[in-house]
């Protein structure tokens, strides 16, 4: 469970949505104590979700995890260093597209999956009803990152194994074990729903400028909140406190 929560946090990089919004959109609370002073905060809520290719803040994800449904537990192998990103060129190692190369378009770290553009696809029917047979669409199936794909070396465009290393500047990079060439992380990985690159983003009226965010406005003091209000309002304390004793 902890692994799933950790991997789910990586989705924010693509969604560019507040973490509180993502957690609230998938939250399913069955019961909670009243918000009174004589109650401890306790809730009964769903903690296990079935993750698929649908993002956790979408309606499709909620439909697949409707309240009250029990799904078979999926065991996921933990990956310490996630090494595949959107925009990576990879080589397929299994299936009908074995040996072909493609570009990663979607990453699902909760299941150790990636989706490659135009590869490992199949036909499926959607929109079927009683009076409408539905339509057939082409859909790419996910590939497992530990056994179904491998990265392509940019020096010779051949599949290769790699490892993480540190440069002299302390930057962590992927290095091909065959050629020693650095495999850079694509710029596509920085894209979100709001912008292609962070530098190309245009600030809007409701955005907080970076200069305002970095401005230090808090000044630590020994005075209490009430003392600060009195100082700003020009109120002087002229009363003499009464003697008190502690036993």
UniProtKB/Swiss-Prot annotation:
Q: DNA-binding: is it a keyword of this entry? A: no
Supply the alphabetized keyword list: Mitochondrion, Ribonucleoprotein, Ribosomal protein, Transit peptide
Which residue numbers delimit the KOW domain?
84-117
Could you tell me where this protein is found in the cell? Answer: Mitochondrion
What residue ranges carry the coiled-coil annotation?
Answer: none
For this protein, the parts annotated as crossing the membrane are none
Which Pfam families does the record associate with it? KOW, ribosomal_L24
Gene Ontology molecular function, alphabetical? RNA binding; structural constituent of ribosome
Leader sequence residues = none
| GO CC, alphabetical | mitochondrial large ribosomal subunit; mitochondrion
In the record, biological process GO terms are:
mitochondrial translation; translation
> Which SUPFAM superfamilies does its entry note?
Translation proteins SH3-like domain
Q: Does the keyword Transmembrane apply?
A: no
Subunit comment: Component of the mitochondrial ribosome large subunit (39S) which comprises a 16S rRNA and about 50 distinct proteins.
Please state what the protein is called.
Large ribosomal subunit protein uL24m
- Organism expressing this protein natively: Drosophila melanogaster (Fruit fly)
